[in-house]
Amino acid sequence: MREELNQGLIDFLKASPTPFHATASLVQRLEAAGYVRLDERETWHTEANGRYYVTRNDSSIVAIKMGRNSPLHDGIRLVGAHTDSPCLRVKPQPELQRQGFWQLGVEVYGGALLAPWFDRDLSLAGRVTFRRDGKVESQLIDFKAPIAIIPNLAIHLNREANQGWAINAQTELPPILAQFAGDERVDFRAVLTDQLAREHGLNADVVLDYELSFYDTQSAAVIGLHGDFIAGARLDNLLSCYAGLQALLNADTEETCVLVCNDHEEVGSCSACGADGPMLEQTLRRLLPEGDEFVRTIQKSLLVSADNAHGVHPNYAEKHDANHGPKLNAGPVIKVNSNQRYATNSETAGFFRHLCMAEEVPVQSFVVRSDMGCGSTIGPITASNLGVRTVDIGLPTFAMHSIRELCGSHDLAHLVKVLSAFYASRELP
């Protein structure tokens, strides 16, 4: 089971270079399992024990397995994650021609570790909006091949490189895509038009706009002398999206189960499809009883907010509280912060720990050092907007927000097992 899950994750990561592609990958797997799309612009007709999903902006998704038991009586079981990861996004007018090289200007999305982006074989993917036969359409594209690189400056020309180097995102991050002689000009939108024709057989009259991100073409892999680790891009937080999906597909229960994967977590979640937007609540209000009964249902429900945790790094162990250093391959981590950067409380933490113990899954705790700031997740945002009890958890990870992150190869199976138990739980606290 472990090897199968890990390979499934690797395949999912490869198919999901952007939030748009991640959502499409989730949709593909849900539809294969019998889930039916609900269109937000139409009237919904649902039934007990039905399986449905809703997307917004092509980058966020809510999947629902309706239970035969009344949500008003038993509550609902929610797992939340996010589809986006820090990256380099192409600017609207990106063309740069310097010293005979054709480059694209980029904007840093989220809190990316920038140095690892240098000297990597990069490709480009995302969503393109275009006009065809007088109609405006959108399509996902993925060049897949390594078409760009951001070469480092040789140490001979930057002797201070190993003593700390502040990277200028405006001048030092534009990737190189080609070299030209003379005054030859390249129209980036024409390149996208060609890609639409090549990848989808679409003859666009004009490319109107796009949302495109560079990504590392190196596939994720199980690595280590004994295969102890998984290295790959976008583990934060596609790892949790995939674990939540597998648990939902495993769910054979009479209870109502929900998986929500939001976009824009890495930039604050404030969007129509982000966790700080109305998507989840609007979806639930259309599926659950109204008014007083809706509030009662939510108060009987529980959200597991799944987002990667910081594993204790052997070279930087002092960056962790001495008593709270989560280890790779030692199970999911319950994340706690007294300032509500995480939504965990003693009741929700206790219930998650109870699930882990019942499933014989190891479990750990994380709290940030008292002299350091703490990151956050969709947990507190969803809890405050929806009023649902929440526990923040995640799998320990190294190099979070790097172009290539690292997690334990045993932990995915641990997380899927406990999330499956959560979906199957007959009673919530």
UniProtKB/Swiss-Prot annotation:
InterPro entries: M18_aminopeptidase_2 (IPR022984), Peptidase_M18 (IPR001948), Peptidase_M18_dom2 (IPR023358). GO terms for biological process: proteolysis. It comes from the Bacteria. Pfam families: Peptidase_M18. It is an enzyme of class 3 (hydrolase). NCBIfam families: PRK02813.1 (NF002759). Belongs to the peptidase M18 family. This is Probable M18 family aminopeptidase 2. The lineage of its organism: Bacteria, Pseudomonadati, Pseudomonadota, Gammaproteobacteria, Pseudomonadales. The gene is apeB.
